[in-house]
């Protein structure tokens, strides 16, 4: 029986030695929100708790400043 290979989760911010997550970096922030606009939990992304808190704060600031949408699922 062949089992599928699960990739090991790791914190990108720790690996890149990021000191603080910037709310203006929307390209990075978009990787941590779902299509519906929800923040992806750390148990799925592998982000450490310290950076998950910074990430949530940065996403919320970016939403408030209209850099990121609150939701993308608007019916047309």
Swiss-Prot record:
Output the InterPro entries linked to this UniProt entry. Ribosomal_bS18, Ribosomal_bS18_CS, Ribosomal_bS18_sf
Q: Which key words tag this protein in UniProt?
A: Ribonucleoprotein, Ribosomal protein, RNA-binding, rRNA-binding
Which Pfam family, any one of them, does this sequence belong to? Ribosomal_S18
**Could you provide one GO biological process annotation from this protein's UniProt record?**
translation
* GO MF annotations in UniProt: small ribosomal subunit rRNA binding; structural constituent of ribosome
Q: Which GO terms describe its cellular component?
A: cytosolic small ribosomal subunit
Question: What role does it play?
Answer: Binds as a heterodimer with protein bS6 to the central domain of the 16S rRNA, where it helps stabilize the platform of the 30S subunit.
Give the record's family classification.
Answer: Belongs to the bacterial ribosomal protein bS18 family.
Subunit composition and interactions: Part of the 30S ribosomal subunit. Forms a tight heterodimer with protein bS6.
Q: What is this protein called?
A: Small ribosomal subunit protein bS18
Q: Which organism is it from?
A: Tolumonas auensis (strain DSM 9187 / NBRC 110442 / TA 4)
Name of the gene encoding the protein in the UniProt record = rpsR
């Amino acid at each position: 029986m062949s089992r599928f290979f699960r990739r090991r989760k790791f914190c990108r911010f720790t690996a890149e030695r990021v000191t603080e997550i910037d709310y203006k970096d929307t390209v990075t922030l978009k990787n941590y929100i779902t299509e519906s606009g929800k923040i992806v939990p750390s148990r799925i992304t592998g982000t450490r708790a310290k950076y998950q808190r910074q990430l949530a704060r940065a996403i919320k600031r970016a939403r408030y400043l209209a850099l990121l949408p609150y939701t993308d699922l608007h019916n047309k």
